[in-house]
Amino acid sequence: EAPANAVTMDDPTAQALKYHPSAADSDRVAAARPGLPPEEQHCANCNFMQADVGEGDYKGCQLFPGKLINVNGWCASWTLKAG
C-alpha cells in the first residue's frame, strides 16, 4: 500500500521524468542512463534517493520534495549513487 504522499504517475514532475514506481515497467531500457546496465537501474541505487526519509519501500527523493518514491521505481534522471 502506497503512502498518501507517494509520487503518482499523473504527477507533472513524474511525467516529465518518466517516473514509474516499477522499474521493470518503466522506459529504463529505451532511456537508459550511464553507470549500470538498464536492468540494474532503480531508485534504491540512485544518487537522488534519500534513504533517511520515509520507510519500507517508500523513500524520499531530491527530485520530488515532500513526496516519497518507490525504491523499486525508475526515472529518466537516474544517477548511480556515489560510493
Curated annotation (Swiss-Prot):
Protein's UniProt keywords contain Transport: yes
Transport listed as a keyword: yes
GO molecular function: 4 iron, 4 sulfur cluster binding; electron transfer activity; metal ion binding
Amino acids binding [4Fe-4S] cluster: 43, 46, 61, 75
PROSITE patterns: HIPIP
Entry-linked Pfam families: HIPIP (PF01355)
Superkingdom field: Bacteria
GO cellular component: periplasmic space
One Gene Ontology term from the biological process aspect of the record: aerobic electron transport chain
Gene3D superfamilies: High potential iron-sulphur protein
Location of the protein in the cell: Periplasm
Family: Belongs to the high-potential iron-sulfur protein (HiPIP) family.
Cited function: Specific class of high-redox-potential 4Fe-4S ferredoxins. Functions in anaerobic electron transport in most purple and in some other photosynthetic bacteria and in at least one genus (Paracoccus) of halophilic, denitrifying bacteria.
The protein's name: High-potential iron-sulfur protein
